[in-house]
């Protein structure tokens, strides 16, 4: 609901159908508990003759066309000197087969993938959203590959989430489970850093940077000695290090042809660009601060809360 700001028409009501009573209670909505399949069958029969206005159908078609153009722009943005992560997604979307599976879980990537990924089949898209479960991508690739040995399984992992669960790679190598890990190294937490900046906190503590000499704050010097590609090699993976999208595509074809678990390592731009988003999230801002950025963010927060609909 975009923190109660998305649905502004007071004449619209929602019927939520859930498979468990616990999840059925939504603010101001009718609550229905039903078997998912039976509910869909009943709704299909009930709404069989329903049609929206032709003007609305045309509006939807125009919006879809406009978004398709935006997807192409994000996939081929040509960011420099480092590629944007959306360019990596575009390359994968082009290279992966209809029955192959892409996996992701945490950070800014699930949002980007939801906005941009063009799934060719229902099985191709495997993304965990619920609690941004950092590290899920590493063991999830094992499970999906065991369930679908005929598919190429590609797990996209950020350098932040990788550090949560790399030890699972030992099992991947031990069992020679042929998966492809795509490691995007941007030396920081992209999603939470952007949120911090939008809340006036200037990305504090969200980048992998050396502490400044004589200071308690990090400067712009990337931490020396942390080598994730070398770490992956130490677990026994084949690692292909690339720097451009053209090199990435070539590396993917090599990984695809291999019979061993492989990581493709590429540095991407911490600052995007990312696909546009218009939803608002109610994340409170400090009401008292000496930082001008926080003071401005607090004023914006008070302004942006006004359109909220309080259903109860």
Predicted feature residues:
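Glycine-rich, acidic loop regions that bind phosphate or pyrophosphate groups
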Residues: 1-62, 196, 256
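Thiamine diphosphate
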Residues: 8, 24-25, 31-33, 37-41, ...
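Structural signal for hydrophobic packing residues in well-ordered secondary-structure cores
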Residues: 40-51, 64, 68-71, 75, ...
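A diffuse structural propensity rather than consistent per-protein peaks
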Residues: 53, 83-84, 227, 244
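Short coil/turn segments at secondary-structure boundaries
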Residues: 55-59, 105-106, 266-267
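Active-site diphosphate/adenylate-binding microenvironment
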Residues: 64-140, 144-145
């Amino acid at each position: 609901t975009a923190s109660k700001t998305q649905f502004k028409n007071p004449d619209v009501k929602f019927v939520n159908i859930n498979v468990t009573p616990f999840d059925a209670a939504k603010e101001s909505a009718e609550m229905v508990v039903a078997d998912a399949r039976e509910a869909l069958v009943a709704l299909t029969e009930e709404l069989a003759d329903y049609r929206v206005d032709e003007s609305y159908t045309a509006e939807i078609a125009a919006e879809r066309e406009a978004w398709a153009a935006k997807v192409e722009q994000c996939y081929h943005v040509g960011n420099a000197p480092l590629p944007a992560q959306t360019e990596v997604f575009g390359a994968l979307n082009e290279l992966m087969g209809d029955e192959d599976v892409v996996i992701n879980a945490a950070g800014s990537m699930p949002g980007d993938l939801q906005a941009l990924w063009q799934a060719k089949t229902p099985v191709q898209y495997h993304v965990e959203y619920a609690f941004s479960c950092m590290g899920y991508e590493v063991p999830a690739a094992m499970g999906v590959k065991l369930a679908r040995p005929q598919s190429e399984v590609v797990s996209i992992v950020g350098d932040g989430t990788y550090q949560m669960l790399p030890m699972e790679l030992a099992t991947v190598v031990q069992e020679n489970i042929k998966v492809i890990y795509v490691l995007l190294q941007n030396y920081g937490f992209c999603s939470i850093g952007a949120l911090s900046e939008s809340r006036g906190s200037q990305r504090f503590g969200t980048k992998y940077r050396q502490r400044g000499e004589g200071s308690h704050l990090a400067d712009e010097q990337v931490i020396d000695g942390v080598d994730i590609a070398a770490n992956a090699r130490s677990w026994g993976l084949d690692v292909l290090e690339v720097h451009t999208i053209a090199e990435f595509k070539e590396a993917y074809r090599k990984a695809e042809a291999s019979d061993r678990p492989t990581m493709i390592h590429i540095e991407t731009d911490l600052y995007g660009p990312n696909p546009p988003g218009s939803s608002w999230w109610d994340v409170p801002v400090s009401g008292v601060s000496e930082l001008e950025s926080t003071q401005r963010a607090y004023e914006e927060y008070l302004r942006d809360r006004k359109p909220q609909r309080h259903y109860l």
